[in-house]
């Protein structure tokens, strides 16, 4: 099983945000997590919302194996087998998920460590797969209207772009535009620890 230190640090702050939008007592809530990584988030959140159906996914086979091992080791029955999913694929190829069937699409720490086309694919799919009034929630470090702060995020962005020119902190203004193109409005921006943010998009 993979263990990501960042996931251990941020899983509770993110859960605090999710609890403001999901009811643990509600049955049948369908959640898709894109780029689930180690599976630590899926396991933590599925335990907190035991009546919801959690669908983890990733493009990396090592992550898929870790997700399966993590959720099985914890005996979680509300987590489905992880999907092999490349976020750049058309939504029709997202594991048979039906249009307007998801209550939440969750994406943690993907946008800044992947090419922009991945974020574009995420928003396109969200426009098709989310139910009306359902949510896309993303988490990570962002530029805000062209400005990156504090200096640690500026340095992080530079490091990412040196590692891969297609990586880097995405601007919330760009994400707002991508959202609007898919019928999603940025409803709220939540300040998180370590200079990260949760962005809450709601489907019209």
Curated annotation (Swiss-Prot):
Top-level taxon of origin: Eukaryota
Record-linked SUPFAM superfamilies: S-adenosyl-L-methionine-dependent methyltransferases (SSF53335)
UniProt KW keywords: Acetylation, Phosphoprotein
Pfam families documented for this protein: DUF938
Modification sites for N-acetylmethionine: 1
UniProt keyword Signal, yes or no: no
Keyword Phosphoprotein on entry: yes
Record-listed Phosphoserine modification sites: 149
InterPro entries: DUF938 (IPR010342), SAM-dependent_MTases_sf (IPR029063)
Family to which this protein belongs: Belongs to the UPF0585 family.
Name this protein carries in UniProt: Methyltransferase-like 26
Source organism of this protein record: Homo sapiens
Gene this protein is translated from: METTL26
């Amino acid at each position: 099983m993979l263990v990501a230190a960042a996931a251990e640090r941020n899983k509770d702050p993110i859960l605090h945000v999710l609890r403001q939008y999901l009811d643990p007592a509600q049955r049948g809530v369908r959640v898709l997590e894109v780029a689930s990584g180690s599976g630590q988030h899926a396991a933590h959140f599925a335990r907190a919302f035991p009546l919801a159906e959690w669908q983890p996914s990733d493009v990396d086979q090592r992550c898929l194996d870790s997700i399966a091992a993590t959720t099985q080791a914890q005996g979680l029955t509300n987590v489905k087998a992880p999907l092999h999913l490349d976020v750049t694929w058309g939504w029709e190829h997202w594991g048979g998920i039906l249009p307007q069937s998801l209550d939440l699409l969750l994406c943690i720490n993907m946008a800044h460590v992947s090419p922009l086309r991945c974020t574009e694919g995420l928003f396109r799919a969200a426009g098709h797969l989310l139910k009306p009034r359902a949510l896309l929630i993303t988490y990570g470090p962002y530029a805000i209207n062209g400005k990156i702060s504090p200096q640690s995020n500026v340095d992080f962005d530079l490091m990412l772009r040196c590692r891969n020119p297609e990586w880097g902190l995405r601007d919330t203004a760009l994400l707002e535009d991508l959202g609007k193109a898919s019928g999603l409005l940025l409803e709220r921006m939540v300040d998180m620890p370590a200079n990260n943010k949760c962005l809450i998009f709601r489907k019209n």
